[in-house]
């Protein structure tokens, strides 16, 4: 029996990619698709909208509750405000939730995850999450004798800075080095000399760059670089669908991440 997956934010860059990935994956089927209230696409079939030549029998709705009720698991790529509504619906309908929404500071995911399974990751790419494990290992092996610089570049419409993925890399380094992440961030906006063990962030925005990340460990003799470049958003969509399948099969309440999959 196929897993029924709902998609919140179905008309966004990621939403369309996820719908197409669901169409091609034999383990799942689309249960419903949500767009923002007032969208001109409400009531239309998702088939032509995602580039399919025929209707798929699924009409776009603005009702988050409706899609949660009809789904086995739901994938959300929206905004902080919309994700909050998804969290409430997940608890109400007792359905697992996968979310890649970033910029969610202030949302206490653990409170909701105590009642339903929730998987949140700033980046759903399998490659990025493998890189995250490598960064943790490098930080352990190199110790705090190296300055750590994390650079990221995204398209010119991305709002949060640094990216959620870059912050995850920074936290991974801090945890491995057993230092406080908040106290060891180095800001390039001040004139202070960089202290030992600082974790710096550099941000670039331009064009349609999907996502480039580089974590550098630097001392006076050498530089170790670990890099990832996203070529197509399909990598995030494929990871999100894999996460939905995994979470639905797991079904134990708790807060998970893509690190639990790789």
Curated annotation (Swiss-Prot):
A Gene Ontology CC term for this entry?
cytoplasm
Q: Where is the active site?
A: 154, 158
Q: Reply yes or no: does the keyword Hydrolase apply.
A: no
What the protein does comes down to: Catalyzes the conversion of 4-hydroxy-tetrahydrodipicolinate (HTPA) to tetrahydrodipicolinate.
Q: What is its main location?
A: cytoplasm
Q: Which segment of the chain is annotated as a signal peptide?
A: none
Keyword check for Oxidoreductase: yes
Lineage runs: Bacteria, Pseudomonadati, Pseudomonadota, Alphaproteobacteria, Rickettsiales
Q: Name one GO biological process term.
A: lysine biosynthetic process via diaminopimelate
> Where does the chain bind NADP(+)?
36
Please give the family membership noted in the entry.
Answer: Belongs to the DapB family.
Which GO MF terms does the UniProt record name? 4-hydroxy-tetrahydrodipicolinate reductase; NAD binding; NADP binding; oxidoreductase activity, acting on CH or CH2 groups, NAD or NADP as acceptor
- Where is this gene product found? Cytoplasm
Q: In which pathway does it act?
A: Amino-acid biosynthesis; L-lysine biosynthesis via DAP pathway; (S)-tetrahydrodipicolinate from L-aspartate: step 4/4
- What EC designation does it have? 1.17.1.8
Keyword list, A-Z = Amino-acid biosynthesis, Cytoplasm, Diaminopimelate biosynthesis, Lysine biosynthesis, NAD, NADP, Oxidoreductase
Q: What is this protein called?
A: 4-hydroxy-tetrahydrodipicolinate reductase
**Gene for this protein?**
dapB
EC top class named in words? oxidoreductase
The catalysed reaction is: (S)-2,3,4,5-tetrahydrodipicolinate + NAD(+) + H2O = (2S,4S)-4-hydroxy-2,3,4,5-tetrahydrodipicolinate + NADH + H(+); (S)-2,3,4,5-tetrahydrodipicolinate + NADP(+) + H2O = (2S,4S)-4-hydroxy-2,3,4,5-tetrahydrodipicolinate + NADPH + H(+)
| Entry binding sites for (S)-2,3,4,5-tetrahydrodipicolinate | 155, 164-165
- Where does the sequence pass through the membrane? none
InterPro entries recorded:
DapB_C, DapB_N, DapB_N_CS, DHDPR_bac, NAD(P)-bd_dom_sf
From which domain of life does this come?
A: Bacteria
């Amino acid at each position: 029996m196929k897993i029924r997956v709902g998609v919140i934010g179905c008309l966004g860059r990621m939403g369309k990619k996820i719908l197409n990935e669901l169409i091609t994956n034999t383990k799942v089927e689309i249960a419903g698709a949500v767009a923002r209230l007032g969208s001109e696409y409400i009531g239309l079939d998702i088939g032509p909208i995602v580039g399919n030549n025929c209707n798929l029998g699924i009409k776009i709705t603005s009702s988050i509750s409706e899609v949660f009720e009809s789904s086995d698991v739901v994938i959300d790529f929206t905004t902080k405000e919309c994700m909050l509504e998804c969290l409430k619906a997940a608890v109400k309908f007792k359905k697992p939730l996968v979310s890649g929404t970033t910029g969610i500071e202030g949302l206490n995911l653990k409170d909701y995850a105590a009642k339903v399974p929730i998987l949140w990751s700033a980046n759903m790419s399998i490659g990025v999450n493998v890189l995250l494990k490598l960064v943790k290992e490098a930080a352990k092996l190199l110790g705090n004798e190296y300055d750590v610089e994390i650079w990221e570049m995204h398209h010119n419409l991305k709002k949060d800075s640094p990216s959620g993925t870059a912050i995850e890399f920074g936290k991974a380094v801090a945890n491995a080095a057993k230092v406080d992440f908040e106290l060891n961030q180095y800001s390039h906006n001040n004139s202070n000399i960089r202290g030992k063990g600082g974790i710096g962030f550099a941000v670039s925005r331009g064009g349609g760059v999907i996502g480039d990340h580089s974590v550098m460990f630097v001392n006076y003799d050498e530089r170790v670089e670990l890099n990832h470049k996203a070529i197509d958003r399909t990598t995030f969509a494929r990871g999100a669908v894999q996460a939905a399948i995994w979470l639905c099969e797991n079904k134990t309440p708790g807060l998970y991440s893509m690190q639990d999959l790789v």
